[in-house]
Amino acid sequence: VIYTAVTSPGEAGFVDDDGNNVGNITGTSDMVLADQQLKLIREMMPDAKKVGIFYSTNEANSKAEIAAYEKAADQYGFEIVTQGITSSADMPMAADSLIKKVDCITNLTDNLVVSNMQTYLEKANKAKIPVFGSEVEQVKLGCVACVGIDFVDLGEQTGEMAAKVLKGEAEAKDMK
């Protein structure tokens, strides 16, 4: 089995606590590099104190990403302020609420949140609150910057892994 764009392979049961593949399985992760993203935000916004994050309360991957941000926040002098949503209908009010509390917003690879990005991007732009993307395409859509995922590159990497397995050059369980 080869997976692609799984945010937290450990949470999904694909790798053990030491990061080793469980069984004959491997793949790629789209976990945001929280430490590097916060470093970028600090460089671009030296006076910022509070970083906002929207997340779906129904996505386990979002909780893993938030934990990574919270772990790295102190190093850069940030407080992470989260705002959960359960459906697209929640986003307008959630955006109004979070934007009032933060200096900027950073995205996760949360499907529900990203599918509603235009809603909060418009509100954030009006309030002059920068939004940092979680992947390259989001910058093209209006986010100010990102140290994030390029899903095309991630797909190519996963495809190369699959090709090696199919050609008998490697076993999934031995790949990282």
List where the protein language model places each region:
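Short beta-strand-centered segments that line the small-molecule binding cleft or hinge
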Residues: 1-18, 121, 126
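Hydrophobic alpha-helical segments within soluble ligand-binding/sensing domains
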Residues: 8-48, 149-170
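Glycine-rich, charge-decorated loop segments at or immediately adjacent to ligand/cofactor-binding or catalytic sites
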Residues: 12-19, 91-93, 139-148
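An alpha-beta-alpha
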Residues: 26-74, 171-176
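Hinge/beta->alpha junction and helix N-cap segments in small-molecule ligand-binding domains
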Residues: 28-35, 55-65, 82-91, 110-111, ...
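Extracytoplasmic/secreted envelope proteins and their assembly/folding machinery
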Residues: 35-38, 66, 70, 92-95, ...
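Hydrophobic alpha-helical
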Residues: 86-141
